[in-house]
Curated annotation (Swiss-Prot):
Bias-annotated ranges (Polar residues): 133-145
Name recorded for this polypeptide: Large ribosomal subunit protein uL3
CC per GO annotation: cytosolic large ribosomal subunit
Name of the encoding gene: rplC
Lineage: Bacteria, Pseudomonadati, Pseudomonadota, Betaproteobacteria, Burkholderiales
The protein's role, per its UniProt record: One of the primary rRNA binding proteins, it binds directly near the 3'-end of the 23S rRNA, where it nucleates assembly of the 50S subunit.
Pfam families: Ribosomal_L3 (PF00297)
Length: 216
């Protein structure tokens, strides 16, 4: 249960260490994370912080949501995201507060969640890294087929979960234990070592890693 940030994937680049080593990084824009609501055990049954990210035209905001945001005194955002946190951390925040890149520190491990790039309808070779059939030696019209998908009369069906052709990508993916290589507090950017899911401009959620010893 840790507070995180909503961000936008700007793209990838590289940075250099003092020793001259090249490090591939993904640039995330985490500006304007605004607190819209603080939930407590007394009022909601659990403790959490709701933040808004981005901007949205007033004509595109429903009346209930507009009232909710007006109560907090916060501009409408493109995304509303809720983070479960403990009561002590929630007490340090207030409606309208801005959570910035200084929430994290260089070298910290984080988990980044996003929606992967859609690949459309794909075969088993592309989707699951199956091997193709032989190109010659009697093989005809069976070069890229997946092979048998079932059995005989018993059990007489295809087992659920069988890896077959189908839609690839466009699913929620979480990459764990990525390292924050650099923080640009002035431009409100996080530079995360390695690649993260999604295309340029995609929305991501950055939270402290949960499976690393000493994660903050």
């Amino acid at each position: 249960m840790s507070l995180g940030l909503v961000g936008r994937k700007v793209g990838m680049t590289r940075i250099f260490t003092a020793e001259g080593d090249s490090i591939p990084v993904t640039v995330l824009d985490v500006s304007d994370n605004r607190v819209t609501q603080i939930k407590t055990v007394e009022t909601d049954g659990y403790t959490a912080v709701q933040v808004a990210f981005g901007s949205r035209r007033a004509s595109r905001v429903t009346k209930p949501l507009a009232g909710h945001l007006a109560k907090a005194g916060v501009e409408a955002g493109e995304i509303l995201k809720e983070f479960r946190i403990d009561a002590a951390k929630a007490a340090e925040l207030s409606n309208g507060a801005v959570v910035g890149a200084d929430l994290f520190e260089v070298g910290q491990k984080v988990d980044v969640q996003g929606v992967s790039i859609g690949k459309g309808y794909a075969g088993t070779i592309k989707r699951y890294n199956f091997s193709s059939g032989r190109a010659t030696h009697g093989n005809s019209r069976s070069h890229n087929v997946p092979g048998s998908i079932g059995m005989a009369q018993d059990p007489g069906r295809v087992f659920p979960g069988k890896r077959m052709t189908g839609h690839m990508g466009d699913v929620t993916v979480t990459v764990q234990n990525l390292e924050i290589a650099r923080i640009d507090a002035e431009r409100k950017l996080l530079l995360v070592k390695g690649a993260i899911p999604g295309a340029k401009g995609g929305k991501v959620f950055v939270t402290p890693a949960v499976k690393t010893k000493g994660a903050k």
